[in-house]
Design a protein with these regions (language model features):
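Helix-to-loop junction immediately C-terminal to a conserved catalytic motif
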Residues: 50
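Conserved ABC ATPase "signature" region
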Residues: 102-120
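Conserved ABC ATPase signature
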Residues: 124-128, 132
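Catalytic Walker B motif of ABC-type/P-loop ATPase nucleotide-binding domains
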Residues: 149-152
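Helix N-cap at the start of a conserved alpha-helix in ABC-type nucleotide-binding domains
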Residues: 160-162
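H-loop/switch region of ABC-family ATPase nucleotide-binding domains
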Residues: 184-185
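A short, surface-exposed alpha-helical micro-motif characterized by mixed small hydrophobic
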Residues: 190-192
């Protein structure tokens, strides 16, 4: 279903421009990190790519097709947990995707074990820790076998140990052949998990570069200031 092509994509709310004429192509292979200060438009851009939002102008197409959502998934910073067990949370998504109840239960159990949640799979999902809930959300998405997985700040609210577990799991998913596209504020995490950086500032795609080059020699004043930890200007 890749590449995903955005052509002059803009998104506005009540006249306020959130995404400003972004053109880019997301291809197979590389781990793509979307980086930028608060309010840069990272999460909105992810939702546009995923299909949760429609652009105000411009076009978004998967391999030339305007609707390619069937082979991709998204995990949010604060995932919604259904009022059922951890295992049933995963199985339910599989049933909605058209799998039989038996097939869904077996696949859900395999994935729950793979993400290290076997010991809590019968507990209500809503009583799990934040780190466990994030791994469960990743398990729900992974179980569907997506070609592309969008991750919106997946460790933003987690302690260091839980964040490490989630990073390890992201590596597992990527090793299985899934394309990772992820937002983060964490520069160290971007270095660890990314191959390329898409840097946003005030809704514009300011820079795109390999991770090492981006951090060693940013091509824009905005990116250089962001790396130094300076507050963005208006």
């Amino acid at each position: 279903m890749l590449p995903l092509a955005l052509e002059q994509v803009s998104f506005a709310v009540n006249g306020k421009i959130i995404i400003d004429r972004v053109s880019m192509e997301i291809t197979e292979g590389l781990r793509t990190i979307i980086l930028g200060p608060n309010g840069a438009g990272k999460s909105v851009l992810m939702r546009l790519c995923h299909g949760l939002l429609d652009p105000t102008s411009g076009s978004i197409a998967w391999r030339g097709i305007s609707n390619g959502r069937s082979r991709q998934a998204m995990v949010f910073q604060r995932p919604v947990m259904l009022r059922r067990s951890a295992l049933a949370n995963v199985a339910y998504g599989l049933e909605l995707a058209g799998h039989s109840r038996l097939e869904s239960a077996l696949r859900a159990r395999d994935v729950i074990e793979a993400v290290g949640l076997a010991a809590v799979m019968d507990r209500p999902a809503r009583v799990l820790s934040g780190g466990e809930q994030q791994r469960l959300a990743l398990a729900r998405a992974w179980a569907l076998g997506p070609e592309v997985l969008f991750l919106d700040e997946p460790t933003a609210n987690l302690d260091p140990g839980a964040a490490r577990d989630v990073e390890t799991l992201i590596g597992q998913i990527r090793a299985g052949g899934t394309k990772i596209v992820m937002t983060t504020h964490n520069l160290g995490q971007a270095r660890r998990l990314g191959d390329e950086i898409l840097f946003l500032s005030q809704g514009r795609l300011v820079e795109r570069a390999p991770v090492d080059r981006f951090f060693a020699k940013p091509a824009s004043a905005e990116a250089e200031a962001f790396i130094r930890g300076e507050l963005p200007w208006n």
